[in-house]
Each structure stands twice: as C-alpha cells, then as structure tokens.
Amino acid sequence: MILRIDGTRVQAYLNPSALGASETVEILTTDGEYLTLEMSKIKSIHFVREFTNHQPAERKTFLSRPKLEGLWVRCLFRDKDSIEGIVANNLVEIANHGLRLTPPDLHGNTLWIFIPRTALSEVKVLGVVGISRRQPAAAASSSQPKLFDE
C-alpha cells in the first residue's frame, strides 16, 4: 500500500529490490493498471499481509522498549506526522535513498515500511537494541604481595 504526500492511498504490487534505485517506482495496482510514481511524491510504502485492511499503521509508537535487534528510531515526516520503528544497524542501508522500517505492531497488517528520504524531515535514534558485543573485563591483578613463595 502506497501513501502519497497528498494523503491518497494506492493499493499496488511492486518489486521491493528496486526501491531506492531510481527517482521513480513502478507499480501494478490491484485493478491491473501499470503506473510509474515519483519517489518525491510518496510518503511511505507499506508492505502488508492483505489489502483488505485500509489502515496503514495500527500503532505508531512502541509501548515498551523493543526486543528486535537494530536501531530504534523515530521518523518525523515533512507533514509533522511521526512513526517509530526498528531499522537495520547498518549505516550503508540507511544513508542513501530511504529507510526500511519494521513497525511497532509486529502482529498487525503491515510487515515493513519503506520511507523515501524525500518524505522525512528528521530521523532520531532512540536506542540501540541487540546483543552486547563487549568483551568480558580482564581479571584485576592482585596488588597484595604473597606471604610465602609457592
């Protein structure tokens, strides 16, 4: 489901591997119509389980600290709307054309969301979630001398 900046929605199929590769996205609507949309006019692309549910995002914030590994972010759109989610902890994927966001409601209709960079005014990292990669602290050497040589 594609949400445009003007507020309209388009139910369509598209190739997710082509996202961010160009300034346009090619879609096939559920009516069988082939369209080319400009990325600058798209607010977000929601990859959904079914088209029957017309709500794009059930919940826009996490109720508690998320458990998925990645960067917990809050995205602020140009229209002052916002959504929280988890993005990959890989800056190469984030920097260029947009964000691939896992939404807060994992059991909802939306599986993941692509947000073009042109639709965003701010992305704030709220936390880093994942496995700690720290090495265990080395045992402190004994500063007290031994009484007997053994």
Label the model's feature ranges.
Residues M1-E150:
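Conserved RNA-binding domains used in RNP assembly and mRNA/RNA metabolism
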